[in-house]
Design a protein with these regions (language model features):
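Secondary-structure transition/capping motifs at alpha-helix termini
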Residues: 175-186, 215, 286-293
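Sec-exported extracytoplasmic/periplasmic mature domains
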Residues: 172-183, 283-284, 308, 432, ...
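Conserved catalytic/binding loops enriched for acidic/polar residues
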Residues: 297-550
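Auxiliary tRNA-acceptor-end handling modules of aminoacyl-tRNA synthetases
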Residues: 1-159, 168, 177, 186, ...
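Soluble non-cytosolic domains of exported or imported proteins
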Residues: 124, 157, 161-169, 268-277, ...
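Short conserved micro-motifs at the rims of enzyme active sites and ligand-binding pockets
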Residues: 165, 246-247, 313-317
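The catalytic-center signature of Zn2+-dependent metalloproteases
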Residues: 191-210, 272-327
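Extended catalytic-interface subdomain
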Residues: 223, 229-237, 275-286, 328-351
Length: 550
């Protein structure tokens, strides 16, 4: 009964219609049920059945006839019933020899918290510790030392080349950060041998997985809730990400001069992204959160969401020589130093940790995360630069140059001409994330995670001049010349041929089978207007005008 239950309320999320767990059609999945020295793993295959008359839409749960909505029937044989495997883990807590480290919101770590009702009056009941692996020097007094037990991650042997080498390279970047924290080869990445199960809690793993559609890669961990000690890191990398990056490069570069070649720059571009992705998700599993701070020092963290950096040369060609970063970032070194440095006996740890963050602030190396991106132009995701309006204009220039060159060279010989649309979509929306970043300056505020006594400026409003510059840049995205798809592109896109039906990576259309030339403009313009007039942004604008009429 414990295993044959809907522990995560999956039935409530299955659409369209209403689903119910059928225990008579469910069973224990023995292939993923096992026991290891420190953990027991159990899995059940649960079957959910669509209830009669619950609004399935007549297509067995495939979205009620709407091809743009993918319901249960898009991933199951039919939407009438679907089986899901649900996994349960029982993990032994570690020994009591680990020493937790205090949480600081400026340090970039996730926290574990609990209420301690025994603390003296005047001290906070909420205890906060960072999440991190246990790591100790063999020689604590040495400036550089090997670890008593290094942190080792094992890559899924099912990962194919050249992706395998790229993932190994990216994950290994973290050893640079641990070296900066005083360790020698304390962070290692190896291929997982057959003798090690990915379910064994004694080993950190990087899994390579497949999905029916693009989805997030993740970096999770099993953490001791008492101390924040990470017991096991689990990275899950989706195999479709690299395909999307490949297609983005095809749209921007239109690289198929003859149509039958395989331009090496496409793989180089995509593999550079995969190296960064590997480092990013591993970073989560060693305790770190996203860092979206727009630093004057440039790309400071692999914990950012990186947008491909493509520059426009004076002759109109595109420069992608620095499309993604190739090393660990300066912030990443600061964060690992904060979380993992072992101090000699007698050191005032709190003072040393605060000093690390103070030195980093002097170099404009700070931490801002997910909750900040909509409110301040100091932090954004999928963006480059640190002046949001200037960067949006630069990206619009790159987009315009690529659109002028875009054509049949964006697809290979033998591909249906209609499939040009797939490469056109990311090119036409090349600026979409920078629109969000630029809108954050409008009604925006600037702030830090200031602590009393650290001397930081807690809060100020974005200047009127900067807000107006951001609005000007956003208005450019609404100009007809930017929204209109050039005629030389429209003339290349026929209706979809048999076997190449509509799917989620295409623009919506209201023109039957013919390509709809208007809806891309509606999509792009709506994107800008929706972010510009977002409810909380509008409220801040009203407030700012009331507080400062100038």
């Amino acid at each position: 009964q414990f295993l044959l239950r809907d522990a995560i309320n999956a039935a409530q999320r299955m659409q369209p219609g209403t689903y119910r767990l059928d225990t008579d059609r469910s069973s224990i999945y023995m292939e993923m049920t096992n026991s290891f020295p420190t953990n027991t793993e159990m899995e059940a295959e649960l079957t959910f059945v669509q209830q009669p008359g619950s609004g399935g839409g007549g297509r067995r749960g495939f979205g009620g006839g709407n091809p743009n909505f993918e319901g249960v029937g898009s991933v199951a044989a039919t939407g009438e019933a679907a089986s899901i495997r649900m996994h349960h883990s029982f993990v032994q807590v570690p020994d009591d020899n680990y020493v937790p480290r205090a949480f600081d919101p400026q340090a970039g770590y996730g926290a574990v918290t609990y209420q301690d009702y025994a603390v003296p009056l005047g001290e906070p009941m909420t205890q906060r510790f960072i999440r991190r692996h246990r790591l100790e020097k063999r020689n604590p007094s040495a400036r550089m030392s090997e670890a008593v037990e290094p942190i080792v991650y094992y890559l899924d042997p099912g990962t194919p080349e050249p992706i395998r080498s790229a993932l190994l390279d990216g994950a290994r970047w973290w050893n640079q950060a641990f070296e900066a924290a005083g360790y020698i080869d304390a962070f290692q990445v190896e291929m997982r041998p057959d003798s090690i199960s990915s379910l064994d809690a004694r080993y950190n793993v990087i899994n390579w997985v497949h999905r029916s559609t693009r989805g997030w890669s993740t970096g999770g961990s099993v953490t001791d809730p008492r101390t924040g000690e990470i017991v096991k890191g689990v990275v899950t990398l989706g195999s479709l990400r690299i395909r999307q990056d490949y297609m983005i490069a095809e749209g921007l570069l239109s690289p198929y001069e003859n149509g039958d070649e395989t331009p090496p720059e496409l793989a180089e571009w995509s593999l550079a992204r995969i190296r960064q992705l590997s480092a990013h998700e591993v970073g989560h599993t060693i305790g770190l959160g996203h860092n979206y701070y727009n630093s004057g020092a440039g790309r400071i963290s692999v914990m950012d969401y990186p947008h491909h950096l493509v520059n426009l040369n004076s002759d109109g060609s595109l420069d992608y020589s620095e499309v993604y970063d190739v090393d660990i970032g300066e912030w990443d070194k600061v964060a690992v130093n904060y979380g993992y440095r072992e101090f000699p006996a007698g050191t005032n740890e709190t003072e040393e940790l605060n000093r690390m963050l103070e030195v980093a602030r002097g170099d404009d190396i700070l931490y801002m995360s997910n909750q900040d991106i909509a409110t301040t132009p100091q932090a954004d995701q999928w963006a480059n630069g640190n002046d949001v309006g200037v960067e949006l204009n630069r990206m619009m220039d790159v987009r315009a140059a690529a659109m002028r060159r875009f054509g049949e060279k964006a697809i290979q010989s033998g591909a249906p001409m209609a499939t040009i649309e797939e490469t056109l979509v990311p090119l036409y929306l090349h600026h979409r994330f920078q629109v969000e970043s630029t809108a954050s300056a409008v009604g925006g505020v600037e702030y830090t995670y200031a602590m009393r006594g650290d001397g930081l400026q807690p809060f100020q409003r974005v200047s009127a001049q900067a807000q107006n510059a951001a609005i000007d840049a956003l208005m450019r995205t609404l100009e007809l010349s930017e929204l209109k798809i050039p005629d030389h592109i429209l003339s290349l896109i026929p209706p979809r041929p048999p076997g190449y039906g509509p799917h989620r990576e295409m623009f919506p259309r209201y023109t039957g089978s013919a390509f709809d030339a208007a809806t891309p403009a509606v999509v792009a313009a709506s994107h800008t207007v929706n972010f510009l007039l977002e409810q909380s942004r509008a409220a801040r604008l009203v407030e700012q005008k009331a507080l400062d009429p100038n």
